Amino acid sequence: MIYLVVLPFATAPLFRLAERLLDASISPSLQNAIYYYTLLAVTLIIFHSFLGHTTRNFADNLGNACKSILVGLIALYGLNELVYRLTRMLVNNHTNLNDTTISAQIHDAPRVTLLIVIFLAPFVEEVLFRGLVFGNLKSKSRTVAYVVSCLLFALLHVWQFAVVRQDITYFLLMVQYLVPGLVLAWAYDHTGTLWSSILLHAAANALHVSAGM
């Protein structure tokens, strides 16, 4: 919940405070880099044992993991096309501000943004949403694990924009992120290693970015 709700709004005041203390300006691209490198470091420290275990599972099931990543990519893009058409029917007057924000950041600072989008964000998000949320709920109910992890993942990508724009209908765009959340959870569940969902997430982001460039 800290990553989902608190950090998006807490980081801006913290960087303003840092600028005053340092008497220097911190560019948005540098802020993003600091933010995600900090998240990466915290994630590695907290989940190092789990990451070691899932890395061994990946090495032991490399063939199955690679096949699952390929199947996941095909499913992701096939289902996404259907969902995209559905959301265009439901919210034709809404632009996906998450995508436009990333596009603007790539234009302003391509190297830093691509590093974040393709490497840092997939790693952090998969550890939290699939490793932590899905992994903990799966032992209680696989269905609940899929539903909750998918909804939280979708909520992450739209709620800030809905709040800033004060438009509750913007939450309808969560539908666009349910398919990725479902496929990524399946990749982890099917292979037993989080690296399947991390690499699938990274590959999907890389293809999405390259298609928009």
Residue ranges and their predicted role:
Residues 1-4, 28-36, 64-69, 109-114, ...:
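Residue-level signature of transmembrane alpha-helical entry/exit and packing/kink sites
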Residues 1-13, 39, 70-76, 146-152:
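Alpha-helical transmembrane segments
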Residues 2-50, 97-108, 112:
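Alpha-helical transmembrane segments in multi-pass membrane proteins
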Residues 13-23, 87, 158-164:
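Juxtamembrane "helix-exit" motif on the non-cytosolic side of transmembrane helices
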Residues 18-29, 88-93, 137-147:
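Membrane interface segments of multi-pass transport proteins and intramembrane proteases
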Residues 23-27, 52-121:
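Juxtamembrane helix-loop-helix connectors linking adjacent transmembrane helices
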Residues 45-55, 187-190:
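Structural signal for the C-terminal ends of transmembrane alpha-helices
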Residues 81, 110-213:
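Transmembrane helix-loop-helix hairpins at the membrane interface
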